[in-house]
UniProtKB/Swiss-Prot annotation:
Main location group: plastid
Residues of the Hflx-type G domain: 346-585
Region Disordered: start-end pairs: 57-100, 478-521, 597-620
Transit peptide segment: 1-65
Gene Ontology MF terms: GTP binding; metal ion binding
Positions annotated to bind GTP: 352-359, 377-381, 399-402, 468-471, 563-565
Protein's name according to its UniProt entry: GTP-binding protein At3g49725, chloroplastic
Nucleotide-binding found in the keyword field: yes
Domain of life assignment: Eukaryota
Record's comment describing the protein's domains: In contrast to other GTP-binding proteins, this family is characterized by a circular permutation of the GTPase motifs described by a G4-G1-G3 pattern.
Protein's cellular compartments: Plastid, Chloroplast
Biological source species: Arabidopsis thaliana (Mouse-ear cress)
Residues that hold Mg(2+) according to the record: 359, 379
């Protein structure tokens, strides 16, 4: 102990004694708020605190004050450290910085595509994943900074699919150790260019797999569902779309509340990723108390964040219900106007796979400038436009959100209020991209989602299937004429050779003992993550049900082939819609026109006895 520190402590003792004796001998200072007993207790506690503070305790206290507190998105702002204090602290090795390196531009993702067979199907899935990665961009001042086709393709790598090798992927990292190291080498090469903000794995990962991959790669990791939610948040413009996108994010993030290693937790990625926080043993354990409880309520951090997410979800559902009520009133008003002065013949919902050309087709049929974009999920709100039919009537065409494969039912339920326009429509128009190599999968996905939201079977049987983009299909046929007959020979053999090579690399560490992982005995094991809540990371929660098989006997082919850009087949489509609406009107003869209702005068119903009693006796 230095002389200066000892002298300071001794001087504080003298000042404290003088103040105590002065207050004790002058009762005028002991007013109604402070009596002598409370004053003596205060002096005694102050002395004990001063004696316990040695120079080492002063240094320890200074270190604690200079440390950055544990970050929590739901913590109060007054406990948030300043930016200068955060920059002074060195970033831990396990922490992940999820902020884009260039805030003015869209996040740049690195795509990891599991290998699929046959190669044509792999190419289709790879193209869809690249479009998803490039679609993650938010509009600035009402428009995107660059055209979709002018953007560079994201860096990507095709790796071994663990589902093909075994019936079950690894429970800790999804991929084998050799594949994980291979991806890390690619990331290190891309980091030299400083072009990667996050890693997009085109598969559905559990919370533990996502956390372990983030720690190994030192990069944020987004799976297929997480990226789709981010795109929903970026493309939502109206109030209802933003509410539904936030609801989908909350339902997804509630299952991602798992504990991370490190006192600082980790930053988040995206608009609503802040719901993912340090959980379970949380704040009380990080403060050195050794317990897993917060305050005196006995509530863990995991339970606290779940309760807050549930409360927010209830508020969102109430606001969405108000918007749903408004749509219900609008639909009721449209139905009342059906048949009045030939105003409308009904409503037609245009459904289909994402980026199938639904908005472009509606713009061509209605001769309006509807918003169209090549990005996936460009339309999130239903938009009504009127189209004139050859019979002289006109119908309302409703543009809806596009569907996509491997989408859990939880996300479909988040957009239930918007998809009610599809259920309540008089006729369905299914738009199919004729250039898609996996066109049967697109058709099956759309039919499966329609069954999930409760579309009646009668509407599905009466649905019109339109194959769009036939102009691109003709261009592809012309290009195939000039292809070399020997081109492509041996590609499958090369893929099989690469597959065997990757299996050889991962053979030593491909299989993982699940009991060892759950007990936390392995090096990369995170079984302790499941100790607090096993249901939160249950893969069955976000498991995508099998797509319903399409009955080929019901659909022999498309009802009509069109090109929304060139206008080919649009007239034939309008005639087909007119015939369908006439058939629907003939099948519903009990519908009474509104003009006749106004001419009637309501009278209470009478039975036969009352009618007989009202007839005069001489006329019976």
């Amino acid at each position: 102990m230095s002389v200066t520190t000892s002298f300071g402590i001794w001087l504080n003792h003298i000042n404290l004694d003088n103040q105590a004796s002065f207050l004790y001998n002058n009762p005028h200072f002991c007013n109604r708020r402070f009596n002598r007993i409370s004053m003596l207790r205060t002096v005694s506690l102050a002395r004990n605190r001063l004696r316990s503070e040695t120079p080492s305790s002063f240094l320890a206290r200074d270190r604690l004050r200079s440390k950055t507190p544990s970050s929590s998105p739901f913590s109060s702002k007054r406990h948030t450290p300043k930016t200068s204090e955060i920059e002074e602290e060195s970033t831990p090795k396990d922490s992940v910085l999820l902020n884009p390196k260039d805030p003015s531009s869209a996040p740049k993702l690195f795509l990891v595509q599991p290998r699929l067979a046959p190669p044509k199907y792999l190419q289709a899935k790879l193209n869809e994943a690249l479009c998803l990665a490039n679609s993650l961009e938010e509009q600035r001042y009402g428009y995107f900074e660059s055209d979709f086709f002018d953007k560079e393709l994201p860096s990507h790598v095709v790796v071994q699919n663990p589902v093909r090798r075994s019936s079950k992927p690894r429970v800790d990292t999804y991929f084998g150790s050799g594949t994980v190291d291979n991806i890390k080498c690619h990331l290190n090469a891309e980091d030299s260019k400083e072009e990667v903000d996050a890693v997009f794995v085109n598969a559905i990962l559990t919370a533990i797999q996502q956390r372990n991959l983030e720690r190994i790669w030192a990069k944020p990791v987004l799976d297929r569902v997480g990226l789709i939610i981010e795109i929903f948040n970026a493309h939502a413009h109206t109030k209802e779309a933003k509410l539904q996108a936030e609801l989908a994010a909350l339902m997804y993030n509630k299952s991602r509340l798992v504990r991370v290693r490190g006192t600082d937790g980790r930053h988040t990625f995206g608009q609503f990723g802040e719901a993912e926080v340090v959980s379970a043993r949380g704040r009380a354990g990080s403060k050195g108390t050794g317990g897993g409880f917060v305050g005196g309520a006995g509530e863990t951090e995991l339970q606290l964040q779940r309760r807050r997410i549930s409360d927010r979800r209830i508020r969102l559902l109430s606001q969405i219900k108000e918007a749903q009520r408004t749509r219900l009133l609008q639909r009721a008003g449209r139905k009342k106007r059906v048949g009045l002065e030939g105003e409308s013949s009904g409503t037609i919902a245009v459904v289909g796979y994402t980026n199938a050309g639904k908005s472009t087709l509606i713009s061509a049929l209605t001769k309006t400038a509807l918003y169209c974009n090549e990005r996936l999920f460009a339309t999130l709100d239903p938009t009504l436009k009127s189209a004139h039919l050859p019979s002289g009537n006109f119908v309302l065409l409703s543009d809806t959100v596009g569907f996509i494969s491997d989408l859990p039912i939880q996300l479909v339920k988040a957009f239930q209020s918007t998809l009610e326009e599809v259920v309540e429509a008089d006729l369905l128009l299914h738009v199919v991209d004729s250039t898609a190599p996996n066109i049967e999968e697109h058709r099956s996905t759309v039919l499966h989602v329609l069954n999930q939201i409760g579309v009646p079977e009668e509407k599905l049987q009466n649905m019109i299937e339109v194959w769009n983009k036939i102009d691109y299909e003709e261009d592809e046929v012309e290009e195939e004429k000039y292809l070399d007959d020997g081109e492509g020979v041996g590609e499958e053999d090369e893929d099989e050779a690469d597959l065997k090579a990757e299996e050889t690399v991962d053979a030593s560490e491909a299989t993982v003992d699940e009991d060892q992982i759950q007990n936390g005995d392995g090096d990369d094991a995170d079984g302790w993550l499941l100790s607090e809540d096993e249901n939160a990371d249950d893969p069955e929660f976000w498991k995508v049900p099998e797509v319903a098989k399409v009955d080929a006997a019901n659909k022999k082919g498309p009802d009509v082939r069109v090109s929304a850009l060139t206008g080919v087949g649009l007239k034939e489509l309008l005639y087909l819609i007119d015939d369908k609406m006439k058939e629907k009107k003939l099948k519903s003869p009990t519908i009474v026109e509104r003009s006749e209702l106004h001419k009637r005068k309501w009278r209470p119903p009478r039975n036969d006895d009352e009618e007989e009693r009202l007839i005069p006796l001489d006329q019976r």
